[in-house]
Amino acid sequence: MHAIMLKAKLHRAQVTHSVLDYEGSCAIDGEWLDLAGIREYEQIQIYNVDNGERFTTYAIRGEEGSRIISVNGAAAHKAGVGHRLIICAYAHYSEAELANFKPHVLYMGADGELSHTSNAIPVQVA
């Protein structure tokens, strides 16, 4: 049996560019892609915290150190500059792989900079 699990997440990444007349995709700072373990051209799910839009696209590598999050092509209608996004990548894992599974989570601060990383999401309390 295989399970589809959260592989990586950029939590509350801030859109720096929204380019309608681009081929498509989402450009993400190369440093953040590496930290999260997201590959260039890998499918990603994007959840817009500000307007509730949810869509699928693929990641492309942005200039390292640029702090770019650019939503491109038709997806530019779903996220504008300044919007906060949750960007997720999922993967299939075997039962054996699940024994040591931990996602890569990058938490972004209000200033658009990386705040901290984690391999777990905190338990939600009532």
Curated annotation (Swiss-Prot):
Pyruvic acid (Ser): residues bearing it: 25
Top EC class of this enzyme: lyase
GO cellular component terms, semicolon-separated: cytosol
Pathway it works in: Cofactor biosynthesis; (R)-pantothenate biosynthesis; beta-alanine from L-aspartate: step 1/1
A biological process term (GO) from this entry: alanine biosynthetic process
PTM comment text: Is synthesized initially as an inactive proenzyme, which is activated by self-cleavage at a specific serine bond to produce a beta-subunit with a hydroxyl group at its C-terminus and an alpha-subunit with a pyruvoyl group at its N-terminus.
Co-factor binding details: Binds 1 pyruvoyl group covalently per subunit.
Family: Belongs to the PanD family.
Protein name from the UniProt record: Aspartate 1-decarboxylase
UniProt lineage: Bacteria, Pseudomonadati, Pseudomonadota, Gammaproteobacteria, Pseudomonadales
